[in-house]
Each structure stands twice: as C-alpha cells, then as structure tokens.
C-alpha cells in the first residue's frame, strides 16, 4: 500500500503495519494496561493499629451514661484509623509484546483510514521558538498534533514544550495513548521507515 507524502511522491509501506483491521478490544486492553502502569500507587492510610495514641480505655464501661468505648483510635472516632485502609500497590498489568505491537499497528492503520496520519518529507524548525512552530503548524492547518520524528529534534522539542495540544516524540517514545490522544499525527518519512522496522 502507499501513503501520500505532503509535497512529495507517495511512500510504499507494509500492509501489515499500516493496513491492519481495527481491533477495538485489543486497543482498549492495551490502553487500559498502559494507563494502569502509569499509576503511582503510593497512597497509604493508617489502620486503627497504626494510628499513634494511647491504648487506654477512654472511660469505664458502665455508669457514665455515654456510649461504651474501648479505644480512641476506633475508626468511628474523629482522628481514628481507617476501616479498610488503602495501602501502596502495583497497578501494572502484563501485556504480551505481540499484543502491544498489534495494538500499535491497529491504531496506525485506523489513523490512515481516518486521514489523521500526515506524512511529511521532514519536519524541522531553525530555532527553538514556539512562535515559529505555531506558524509552521498553522501553514499546515494543524492545531492539535503529535509530531513523530526519527530522532528527537531539540529545537522542535523545546518549541512544543508549552503548547497544550502539540507534542513531539521520536519513534522510540511513541505509545498507544499518545497516538490516539491527538487529532492529527504528523510523521516524517524516516520515522515511517523506523516504525516499519520496529513493528514488522
């Protein structure tokens, strides 16, 4: 199959990477697993056993007229412990390499079908200036875009750093979440070739 390149001849690419069927279930599973792996999982609350304080019975069992109480660290008391206290945990999910690659290829194929993949000969700017990058994107009628290059361009990276709807990645740093998060994905010819090699 061929991909149209802006201002250049069409690029012949592999059908297995850019022409796969859309597998929604696989993409969903991989995206959920990727997001789960990004969770910090460090929250921690104290049970009644871990709260600092005296173990003395606050008042005698009978005769005061108050409700019976045996511990100031009881979960029903203010400043007491938490009944089912949250503890640090690892939320990561196992995803087989074959599944991950399949999801990436399925996403790339769907981007092609929806005309959301924009292939360019090269994508560079002369200086690390946000204004320059904004103008370049404006000339291409783009406002919300992920830019993928073969190797990380420092000028592009610095210029895009404070643009909310623009991100710059090299091929090694692409992931399923970033690929589906933007309206358009701008990718250079060299990056397309690298992607084919990586996910062949």
Curated annotation (Swiss-Prot):
Keywords: Ribonucleoprotein, Ribosomal protein, RNA-binding, rRNA-binding. InterPro entries: Ribosomal_uL4, Ribosomal_uL4-like, Ribosomal_uL4_dom_sf. The keyword rRNA-binding applies. GO terms for biological process: translation. Residues 43-71 are annotated as: Disordered. It comes from the Bacteria. Pfam families: Ribosomal_L4. One of its GO terms (molecular function) is structural constituent of ribosome. GO terms for cellular component: ribonucleoprotein complex; ribosome. The keyword Cell inner membrane does not apply. Part of the 50S ribosomal subunit. Belongs to the universal ribosomal protein uL4 family. One of the primary rRNA binding proteins, this protein initially binds near the 5'-end of the 23S rRNA. It is important during the early stages of 50S assembly. It makes multiple contacts with different domains of the 23S rRNA in the assembled 50S subunit and ribosome. This is Large ribosomal subunit protein uL4. It comes from Histophilus somni (strain 129Pt) (Haemophilus somnus).
């Amino acid at each position: 199959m061929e991909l149209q390149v802006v201002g250049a001849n069409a690029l012949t690419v592999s059908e297995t990477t850019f022409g796969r069927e859309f597998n929604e279930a696989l993409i969903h599973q991989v995206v959920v697993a990727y997001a789960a792996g990004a969770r910090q999982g460090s929250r921690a609350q104290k049970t009644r056993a871990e709260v600092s304080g005296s173990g003395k019975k606050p008042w005698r069992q009978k005769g005061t007229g108050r409700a019976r109480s045996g511990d100031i660290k009881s979960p029903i008391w203010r400043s007491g412990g938490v009944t089912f206290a949250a503890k640090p945990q690892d939320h990561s999910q196992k995803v087989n390499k074959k599944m991950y690659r399949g999801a990436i290829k399925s996403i790339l194929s769907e981007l092609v079908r929806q005309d959301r993949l924009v292939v360019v000969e090269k994508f560079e700017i002369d200086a690390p200036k946000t204004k320059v990058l904004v103008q370049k994107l404006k000339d291409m009628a783009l406002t919300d875009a992920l830019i993928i290059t073969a190797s990380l361009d420092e000028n592009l990276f610095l210029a895009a750093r404070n643009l909310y709807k623009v991100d710059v990645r090299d091929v090694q740093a692409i992931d399923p979440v970033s690929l589906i998060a933007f309206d358009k994905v701008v990718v250079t010819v060299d990056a397309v070739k690298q992607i084919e090699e990586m996910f062949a």
